[in-house]
Curated annotation (Swiss-Prot):
Classification of source organism: Eukaryota, Metazoa, Chordata, Craniata, Vertebrata
Name of the protein this chain belongs to: Doublesex and mab-3 related transcription factor 3
Note from the entry: DMRT3 is a marker for a subset of spinal cord neurons (dI6).
Tissues/organs with expression: Expressed in the spinal cord, in a small population of neurons located in the ventral horn and around the central canal.
InterPro entries: DM_DNA-bd, DM_DNA-bd_sf, DMA, DMRT, UBA-like_sf
GO CC annotation terms, alphabetical: nucleus
Keyword set includes Cytoplasm: no
Biased composition (Low complexity): 415-428
Gene: DMRT3
Biological process annotations from GO: adult locomotory behavior; adult walking behavior; male sex differentiation; regulation of odontogenesis of dentin-containing tooth; regulation of transcription by RNA polymerase II; transmission of nerve impulse; ventral spinal cord interneuron specification
UniProt-annotated stretches for the region Disordered: 89-130, 157-228, 415-474
Function: Probable transcription factor that plays a role in configuring the spinal circuits controlling stride in vertebrates. Involved in neuronal specification within a specific subdivision of spinal cord neurons and in the development of a coordinated locomotor network controlling limb movements. May regulate transcription during sexual development.
GO molecular function list: DNA binding; DNA-binding transcription factor activity, RNA polymerase II-specific; metal ion binding; RNA polymerase II cis-regulatory region sequence-specific DNA binding
Length: 474
């Protein structure tokens, strides 16, 4: 035990010294190791003492290096050739495959197999066969490679085991088979539409030559490609519409809507599509649900009491509970018709018999007696928080223009209590200078009402319908 270190190896070091991290393994020269010498490999190849040795172990190392170099060159050449033959001319302008340098780096390198000590002559023909196969595959044209891959949806069962490429086939790892059997790869092989310009990856391209010798008939018994699944079914409240998959290929949604609903006007279809935010499925659901407006109108006209105003504040819940609950927006009813809950019965003398059913001049002779309490958030109850209804679609702008309502609420209380709603910004009442509500009944004396707003408050508010809609929606 001196200051220069102990010649012995102690397993347990002192407690105060932290344990050292294991050093990274540095590569050593294999030929020198065969002869019992440890040499660092970096910068050693030119000066190795055993570089010209022809013993059995050194020849085995030479042959192993040749086989690995031939495999790497073969895989690189296969990737380049198969990609050039697989990409059609229509997809050449799209973003191309990664460069072959990245492809060779991404391809998994075969691990060095530990072979027993044996004479090299059986190893030499395998390397020559691999190089000859690479040259043969590079020179042969492959016109049917694309058709063979398009006709096979299941790629995992189409591996060939030729004797010439046996050692090449064994070197592919499990990552390639998982990547080939994934549904995304099957989809990109199955249809080369402009919506799916996925280029075949490099690892799959290496298999194009091997799959070329297999059978190229399509597989109708595959569970993913049944004949009845060539159409996309969209369900609505009044029926279903089947969309063929050919409509989805590089076609704008407005054209698809014109194909499905030829009896609708293009402007109406465009408005519905804009209202749905460009979502084709939501627009189809809106158009499907608008078909049921006639039957809903007949059902509503059979009920004389179509507008019921309960006093507990839950407005229209009894009529809206019959709608089906769906999570998609605008799935029930059309935005271009009056909701069924707001249709007035036809036996009243002052109702125009048109689809909008707008009252003429005075549907309510005294609005303070019969307040129309409309909410913009009718679906915000705990039982069904996402209940779609027509009142939320048919916004309060039309109601404000027709019924001259300032906001969501007209106060049913007399004008002698203005301080009740004075501080509430959500419940403003309108000024009483409207000639509509100044017509009293014959038996009711006219009572002068106190104005709830001063002129300054009234001037500060904006009278545009857009700002009122923003206020009510907030």
């Amino acid at each position: 035990m001196n200051g220069y270190g102990s010649p012995y190896l102690y397993m347990g070091g002192p407690v105060s010294q932290p344990p050292r991290a294991p050093l990274q393994r540095t590569p050593k020269c294999a030929r020198c190791r065969n002869h019992g010498v440890l040499s660092w490999l970096k910068g050693h190849k030119r000066y190795c003492r055993f570089k010209d040795c022809t013993c059995e172990k050194c020849i085995l190392i030479i042959e192993r290096q040749r086989v690995m170099a031939a495999q790497v060159a073969l895989r690189r050449q296969q990737a380049n050739e198969s990609l050039e033959s697989l990409i059609p001319d229509s997809l050449r302008a799209l973003p191309g495959p990664p460069p072959p340098g990245d492809a060779a780096a991404a391809a998994p390198q075969p691990p060095p197999t530990s072979q027993p000590s044996q004479p090299p002559p059986p190893q030499r023909p395998a390397a020559e066969l691999a190089a000859a196969a690479a040259l043969r595959w590079a020179t042969e044209p492959q016109p049917g490679a694309l058709q063979a891959q398009l006709a096979k949806p299941d790629l995992t069962e189409e591996r060939l085991g030729d004797g010439s490429s046996a050692d090449n086939t064994e070197t592919f790892s499990d990552k390639d088979t998982d990547q080939r059997s994934s549904p995304d790869v099957v989809k990109s092989k199955g249809c080369f539409t402009p919506e799916s310009p996925e280029v075949v990856s490099v690892d799959e391209g290496g298999y194009a030559v091997q799959k070329n010798g297999g059978t190229s008939e399509s597989r109708p018994d595959s569970p993913k490609y049944h004949g009845e699944q060539n159409h996309l079914l969209i369900e609505g409240p009044s029926g279903t519409v089947s969309l063929p998959f050919s409509l989805k290929a590089n076609r704008p949604p407005l054209e698809v809507l014109k194909k499905i609903f030829p009896n609708q006007k293009p402007t109406v279809l465009e408005l519905i599509l804009k209202g749905c935010g460009g979502d084709l499925v939501s627009a189809v659901e809106v158009l499907l649900s608008s078909r049921s407006s006639a039957s809903a109108a007949d059902r509503t006209s059979a009920e004389p009491e179509s507008l019921v105003l309960p006093s507990n504040g839950h407005i229209f819940e009894h009529t809206l509970s019959s709608y089906p609950i769906s999570s998609s927006k605008w799935s029930v009813g059309s935005a271009f018709r009056v909701p069924d809950t707001l249709r007035f019965s036809a036996d009243s003398s002052n109702v125009v018999p048109n689809p909008l059913a707008v009252p003429l001049q005075h549907p309510f002779p005294q609005p303070p007696r019969y307040p129309l309490m409309l909410r913009n958030t009718l679906a915000r109850n705990q039982s069904s928080p996402f209940l779609p209804n027509d009142v939320t679609l048919w916004n309060t702008m039309t109601l404000q223009q027709q019924y001259q309502l300032r906001s969501q609420y007209v106060s049913p209380f007399p004008g002698s209590s203005p301080s009740v709603f004075r501080s509430s910004p959500v419940l403003p009442t309108r000024a009483p200078e409207d000639p509509r509500i100044s017509i009293p009944d014959d038996g009711c004396p006219i009572v002068s009402k106190q104005s709830l707003y001063t002129e300054d408050d009234y001037d500060e508010r904006s009278d545009s319908s857009d700002s009122r809609i923003l206020n009510t929606s907030s």
